Amino acid sequence: MGSMEASTAPENGTAAAAAAAASTACNGAGGGGGAAAASNGGGVERRLRSSAASASWASHLPLEVGTRVMCRWRDQKLHPVKVIERRKSSTSSSPADYEYYVHYTEFNRRLDEWVKLEQLDLETVETDVDEKVEDKATSLKMTRHQKRKIDETHVEQGHEELDAASLREHEEFTKVKNIAKIELGRYEIDTWYFSPFPPEYNDSPKLFFCEFCLNFMKRKEQLQRHMKKCDLKHPPGDEIYRSGTLSMFEVDGKKNKVYGQNLCYLAKLFLDHKTLYYDVDLFLFYVLCECDDRGCHMVGYFSKEKHSEESYNLACILTLPPYQRKGYGKFLIAFSYELSKKEGKVGTPERPLSDLGLLSYRGYWTRVLLEILKKHKSNISIKELSDMTAIKADDILSTLQSLDLIQYRKGQHVICADPKVLDRHLKAAGRGGLEVDVSKLIWTPYKEQG
């Protein structure tokens, strides 16, 4: 799960430290007495070699920012990392008393973390590496399974992607996570990315969120005092959907500005290239909750602009890590299209989509469109499909083309849908997740008052 993948692994450092201590103990035992040393020339040679290696390692300390080295990860295997930042771990002046913020070059940035010196294999230190060559080599070493395992839970998208120059500037500014963990309801969650909280909250090891109003605090005692005063048991706004234990609330950013801003702060901890909007007045937030006798607990949300000239029906989407891989992301996408149907409009997610965002949407479009084509015996046009599904015609065309279900005949696109081919594509698209019970949706489209 995402939260587990994003967690730090202090046991790695402990294990490495224990191994180092055992190694030191063995070397000490080997050189404990003159007689033993004299009777074992190999022991003397090993000690001299070890001493020379230690001197060589010491010359690298403290490691410079940009250094490449192998680091022991939570799988107890060594992985290539790049040192992004460093900090002193004690008041000692020893060059060994540093911690290092590292990026695992095989993995997504969300796994970046602070590690102790014991986790690093100093024999592998590289200080002068051509980044393009190194990154290409790392990419080649990574298997398709590794990439999928790390990235499959991260299909959320931000309000907009960034061009190359903006991306470099963004990564430099956000290179070190400022908040390591949050507590939200009954979950402690490891964060994935930097979020621009007010300066007084930066570098807090942990922030405590009220799961209902999303106010955040530095200390557990503050949260406990707050919870005694907070009257909310669900997100502010109107409950527009209730089916079993699932509820959806529509929150107007203009009416609930602080909640909207706090939601953006929270979301940015788990979305890399999300543009943080302080002007939340322009957005509606649809917050999905699991409900019990204690209240309605947020599991994820999507936002949409109140007025979009491009027919965008979704700007940002997030499922919180503890609730991922349960079908909630697919539910949120489906819900956005049900709102478009109620509006009598076609919709599409805000562009451009990330690769994984496109993969998630392409799966939804495939399932919806092919289910209709399976049941529809006569000819059907792309416009008719769009009217039935609220999916934009361009998205329908690109999806069917990617499945080789479109042919161009006599100046027009023709859908060619063999039942066996449809079944094969549907199987590849996977399950649709939780279904939206449209009969439980009570909602009228947003209209500006006055």
Curated annotation (Swiss-Prot):
One Pfam family named in its UniProt record: zf-MYST
EC number: 2.3.1.48
GO MF, one annotated term: chromatin binding
Post-translational modification: Autoacetylation at Lys-274 is required for proper function.
Positions with a binding annotation for acetyl-CoA: I317, L318, T319, Q324, R325, K326, G327, Y328, G329, K330, S354
Active-site residues (renumbered): E350
Record's subcellular location: Nucleus
Catalytic reaction list: L-lysyl-[protein] + acetyl-CoA = N(6)-acetyl-L-lysyl-[protein] + CoA + H(+)
SMART domains given in the database record: CHROMO
Keyword line: Acetylation, Activator, Acyltransferase, Chromatin regulator, Metal-binding, Nucleus, Transcription, Transcription regulation, Transferase, Zinc, Zinc-finger
GO terms for biological process, alphabetical: regulation of transcription by RNA polymerase II
Keyword field contains Acetylation: yes
Span of domain MYST-type HAT: 174-445
GO CC entries: chromatin; NuA4 histone acetyltransferase complex; nucleus
Family listed: Belongs to the MYST (SAS/MOZ) family.
Physiological role: Histone acetyltransferase which may be involved in transcriptional activation.
Protein name: Putative MYST-like histone acetyltransferase 1
